Each structure stands twice: as structure tokens, then as C-alpha cells.
């Protein structure tokens, strides 16, 4: 069978080695004679798995000791509401930086739940010569007492990524769903990091939360117990039955990433993959990208065919060539190639070859 390269934005492809291992031990995990999907989440064997998963993630991301690592339900959208309910209180204030679709969605959820609390927002994307560009504000010049400032460093729909570290006088809450472990960051700069698992961690249904200890002292709002960070910490992410199979696969992905050299190693590969694809787009008048070079996403490369009438044929021929899930988000259209950690360099080589051949044929 010819290789299939899955460019889906999420749920995304998983490392081939992880998938093969999961396949091999699906019916008999760890010598238990049953699947990991069937074993008790409170068994000593599964507890050992969760402890190893947290240890590996802490090592990979260099997470300081004063941070808790939580494995929770609900994905990224679940965390939109959890952040508000856990930190805002009845009279709190929060600032949301808007750079695209997902930060806009987080803002909308905060506004819906805030009640008497105050939610402010700043649009940080401007047009520079017709291209989208991020302009980070000087937050130290804002006279306000915010509980936190929320932002999304990578917008998967818009193909926008913020590489500069945010400098804030208030705790930073970051949605890292699409960039977690794709490049190195300084975790100590953040009050809370959350990430839906279905891009760089594992299957959908799981979210990772990395929260600094002092954030748990902020006033909270009434909320569902399963989204209460304090309860999650108290019960080691097992206040209720967790998504065990997703947790198992996340543990395997962490182990795989360590075996490949860790985040510093994968970051170099990710940069190389993105550069190859953007060079193809920029070097051919057949394609275009709408983001300034400094803010082009390494994880989600968006592009359009200058002749949009060829979109359908492009996707059809790409599918035949084994290049799947290249259709852009329904909101913005065009094309999108998601280059998460599991996407091998060979996938980009194949995509660039196809794009060049398609352009030559239809120019």
C-alpha cells in the first residue's frame, strides 16, 4: 500500500510507531490479558502509566515543581469555560487577546459565563500590505487589575502563529492546543497552559492542563466538579473516570517524542517542514498565502490557489496521490496543511512535489 499522509488539523495523525504499538497490545496490554481500555483506572498498573506520562511530560517541557499537570476531559473548548469558572470569581477582570478564530471563540465563551465580572479584549491582528500580521500590545501600559490575560499563540484556522514571548504584568493563560511540544517554551512564564490532545498529544477527548500553584488560590465561580482544577489536583486527575485510552496514547506519544530527541529535536524538523512548504508557495505564482512571514504558522500552513475554480480538482488529485485532509477550514476556505509533530518530512516532500506538478499542469 502506498503511503498516505494525513494533513488533518485535528484529530490529527499520530506517530506511526505509536499506532503500531497500540495495535500490537490492543487486546493484551502490559501482560494483563485485557485491553488498556478495559482495565480499572485505579489499578496499580494504570496508575503507573499515569505517573510515567506526567514524568515524561514534565521532562519534555521542563515543567517547574510549582506547577500541577492535569489530564482532563473536554478538549480545548472545555477549557474555555473552565478557565473563566476557576479564576474569574464574581467581580474579577480578564483580558483576551484576539488573533483569530480560536481566541475569538475563547472570548465568546468568557463573555457568556462572566456574569458581573468584566471581560476586556484587544484585536492584535492588523493588515500589513494586505497580509495578516500580529502586533503585540505593550500590556504594561494598560492600567487595569486583571486576574489573567488569555491568548492563543497559534490559530489553526487562520494560519497565524505568535513566536514572540508575551510580556505581561498579569498571569498568562495560553491555549497551546496546536503548538504544545512543537517548539520549546519557558513554562515558568505562564500561569496556566491548556491543550486539547488531538493535534500533538493523542486522540480527541483529552486535554492537558499545566497550572501554577498560586493560580489555584484565585476566587472561582460555581461550576461542574469535573472541570474544577482544585478537585483535579486533589484527586490526581481522577475525580471521575478519565478518558483512559486517550491517556494511554498520550503516554506513548510522550515516550516516542523522548526517543526522537525531545522537543529541541522535533522543533528543528518542524521548522524545516514549514520552510519547505512556504518556499513552494512563495516560489510559485499559482499559490498564495495571506500572512506576513514573521507570523506564518509552522503547524498549520494555509494557502489558496490563485484560480479558486481549481480547488476541487486540486483536492481530488491530492487524494489520489495519498495526500488527504488538505481542505481549508469552512470559515476561510482554500487549503490547509497541518504539519504537527507526527507528520514526517517525507510527507512534505510528497506534498511539495504534488503542488509543483499540479501548478505546472494547470498554469
UniProtKB/Swiss-Prot annotation:
Highest taxon in the source lineage: Bacteria
Transmembrane segments: none
N6-(pyridoxal phosphate)lysine modification, residue list: 199
Localization per Swiss-Prot or TrEMBL: Cytoplasm
Cofactor binding mode and count: Binds 1 pyridoxal phosphate per subunit.
Pfam families per record: Aminotran_5
Cellular component GO terms, alphabetical: cytoplasm
The keyword Cytoplasm belongs to this UniProt entry's keyword annotation: yes
One GO BP: pyridoxine biosynthetic process
Gene Ontology molecular-function annotations: O-phospho-L-serine:2-oxoglutarate aminotransferase activity; pyridoxal phosphate binding
Residue positions binding pyridoxal 5'-phosphate: 76-77, 102, 156, 175, 198, 240-241
Catalytic activity: O-phospho-L-serine + 2-oxoglutarate = 3-phosphooxypyruvate + L-glutamate; 4-(phosphooxy)-L-threonine + 2-oxoglutarate = (R)-3-hydroxy-2-oxo-4-phosphooxybutanoate + L-glutamate
Biological pathway: Amino-acid biosynthesis; L-serine biosynthesis; L-serine from 3-phospho-D-glycerate: step 2/3; Cofactor biosynthesis; pyridoxine 5'-phosphate biosynthesis; pyridoxine 5'-phosphate from D-erythrose 4-phosphate: step 3/5
Keyword Cytoplasm listed: yes
Top-level class of the enzyme under EC nomenclature: transferase
InterPro entries linked: Aminotrans_V_dom, Aminotrans_V_PyrdxlP_BS, Pser_aminoTfrase, PyrdxlP-dep_Trfase, PyrdxlP-dep_Trfase_major, PyrdxlP-dep_Trfase_small
EC nos: 2.6.1.52
Residue sites binding L-glutamate per the record: 42
Principal subcellular localisation of the protein: cytoplasm
Cofactor or coenzyme needed: pyridoxal 5'-phosphate
Keywords linked to the UniProt accession: Amino-acid biosynthesis, Aminotransferase, Cytoplasm, Pyridoxal phosphate, Pyridoxine biosynthesis, Serine biosynthesis, Transferase
Family statement drawn from the similarity comment of this UniProt entry: Belongs to the class-V pyridoxal-phosphate-dependent aminotransferase family. SerC subfamily.
Role noted for this protein: Catalyzes the reversible conversion of 3-phosphohydroxypyruvate to phosphoserine and of 3-hydroxy-2-oxo-4-phosphonooxybutanoate to phosphohydroxythreonine.
Subunit and partners: Homodimer.
Name of this chain's protein: Phosphoserine aminotransferase
Protein species of origin: Shewanella baltica (strain OS195)
Classification lineage: Bacteria, Pseudomonadati, Pseudomonadota, Gammaproteobacteria, Alteromonadales
Amino acid at each position: 500500500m502506498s503511503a498516505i499522509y494525513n494533513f488533518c488539523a485535528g484529530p490529527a495523525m499520530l506517530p506511526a510507531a505509536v499506532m503500531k504499538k497500540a495495535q500490537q497490545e490492543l487486546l493484551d496490554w502490559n501482560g494483563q490479558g485485557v485491553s488498556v481500555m478495559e482495565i480499572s483506572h485505579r489499578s496499580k498498573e494504570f496508575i503507573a502509566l499515569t505517573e510515567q506520562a506526567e514524568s515524561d511530560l514534565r521532562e519534555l517541557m521542563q515543567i517547574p515543581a510549582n506547577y500541577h499537570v492535569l489530564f482532563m476531559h473536554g478538549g480545548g473548548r472545555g477549557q474555555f469555560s473552565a478557565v473563566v469558572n476557576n479564576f474569574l470569581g464574581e467581580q474579577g477582570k480578564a483580558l483576551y487577546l484576539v488573533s483569530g478564530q480560536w481566541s475569538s471563540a475563547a472570548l465568546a465563551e468568557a463573555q457568556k459565563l462572566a456574569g458581573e465580572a468584566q471581560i476586556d479584549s484587544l484585536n492584535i491582528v492588523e493588515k500589513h500590505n494586505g497580509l495578516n500580521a500580529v502586533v503585540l500590545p505593550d500590556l504594561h501600559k494598560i492600567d487595569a487589575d486583571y486576574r489573567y490575560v488569555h491568548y492563543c499563540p497559534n490559530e489553526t484556522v487562520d494560519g497565524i502563529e505568535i513566536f514572540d514571548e508575551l510580556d505581561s504584568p498579569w498571569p498568562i493563560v495560553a491555549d497551546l492546543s496546536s503548538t504544545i511540544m512543537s517548539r520549546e517554551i519557558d513554562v515558568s512564564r505562564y500561569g496556566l497552559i491548556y491543550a486539547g490532545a488531538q493535534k500533538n498529544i493523542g486522540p480527541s477527548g483529552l486535554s492537558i492542563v499545566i497550572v501554577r500553584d498560586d493560580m489555584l488560590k484565585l476566587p472561582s465561580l460555581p461550576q461542574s466538579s469535573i472541570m474544577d482544577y482544585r478537585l483535579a489536583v486533589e484527586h490526581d486527575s481522577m475525580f471521575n473516570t478519565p478518558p483512559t485510552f486517550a491517556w494511554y496514547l498520550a503516554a506513548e506519544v510522550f515516550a516516542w517524542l523522548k526517543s526522537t530527541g525531545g522537543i529541541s529535536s522535533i522543533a528543528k524538523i518542524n521548522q524545516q517542514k514549514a520552510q519547505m512548504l512556504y518556499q513552494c508557495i512563495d516560489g510559485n505564482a499559482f499559490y498564495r498565502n495571506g500572512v506576513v512571514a514573521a507570523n506564518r504558522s509552522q503547524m498549520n500552513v494555509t494557502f489558496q490557489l490563485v484560480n479558486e475554480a481549481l480547488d476541487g480538482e486540486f483536492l481530488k488529485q491530492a487524494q489520489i496521490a495519498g495526500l488527504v485532509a488538505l481542505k481549508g477550514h469552512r470559515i476561510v476556505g482554500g487549503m490547509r496543511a497541518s504539519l504537527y509533530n507526527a507528520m514526517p518530512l517525507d510527507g512534505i516532500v510528497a506534498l511539495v512535489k504534488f503542488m509543483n506538478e499540479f501548478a505546472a499542469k494547470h498554469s
